[in-house]
């Protein structure tokens, strides 16, 4: 469950290390984002010579949440940390690698590039 001011790890090699959610997209009063939702983030920490810089405002998709996600069959899945993948204007990942597992709910939301780059899909 991601809301404004939530800090997230970045699960790709775009150059950002930590981002902060500044807006949840999808409705004028939408408060929370879960796995597969697109948010607007500000880069708070970045590595030198990366594709994104500290202070950049970008869109990102949430790939892991500490709040459990309930599935159709009744099972739940949760992670230790919140994580996101930074997107470009076309909705494709900026980075060329994805670190850590991602959930298969991303497949239903047509993030096939992230699914194919991820080392593990849970």
UniProtKB/Swiss-Prot annotation:
GO cellular component term of the entry, any: cytosolic large ribosomal subunit
Entry GO MF terms: large ribosomal subunit rRNA binding; structural constituent of ribosome
Key words, A-Z: Ribonucleoprotein, Ribosomal protein, RNA-binding, rRNA-binding
Signal peptide: none
One example of a Gene Ontology biological process annotation: translation
Superkingdom of source: Bacteria
PANTHER family from the UniProt entry: 50S/60S RIBOSOMAL PROTEIN L14/L23, LARGE RIBOSOMAL SUBUNIT PROTEIN UL14M
Subunit structure: Part of the 50S ribosomal subunit. Forms a cluster with proteins L3 and L19. In the 70S ribosome, L14 and L19 interact and together make contacts with the 16S rRNA in bridges B5 and B8.
Family designation: Belongs to the universal ribosomal protein uL14 family.
Described purpose of this protein according to its UniProt entry: Binds to 23S rRNA. Forms part of two intersubunit bridges in the 70S ribosome.
Record NCBIfam families: rplN_bact
Stated name of the protein: Large ribosomal subunit protein uL14
Originating organism: Cereibacter sphaeroides (strain ATCC 17023 / DSM 158 / JCM 6121 / CCUG 31486 / LMG 2827 / NBRC 12203 / NCIMB 8253 / ATH 2.4.1.) (Rhodobacter sphaeroides)
Organism lineage string: Bacteria, Pseudomonadati, Pseudomonadota, Alphaproteobacteria, Rhodobacterales
């Amino acid at each position: 469950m991601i809301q404004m001011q939530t800090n997230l790890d970045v699960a790709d090699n775009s150059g950002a290390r930590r981002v902060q959610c500044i807006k949840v997209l999808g409705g004028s009063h939408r408060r929370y984002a879960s796995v597969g939702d697109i948010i607007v983030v500000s880069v708070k920490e970045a590595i030198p010579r990366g594709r994104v810089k500290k202070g950049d405002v970008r869109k990102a998709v949430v790939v892991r949440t500490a709040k459990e996600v309930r599935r159709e069959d009744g099972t739940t899945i949760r992670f230790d940390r919140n994580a996101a993948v930074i997107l470009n204007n076309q909705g494709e990942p900026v980075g060329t690698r994805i670190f850590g597992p991602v959930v298969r709910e991303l497949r239903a939301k047509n993030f096939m590039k992230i699914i194919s780059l991820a080392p593990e899909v849970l």
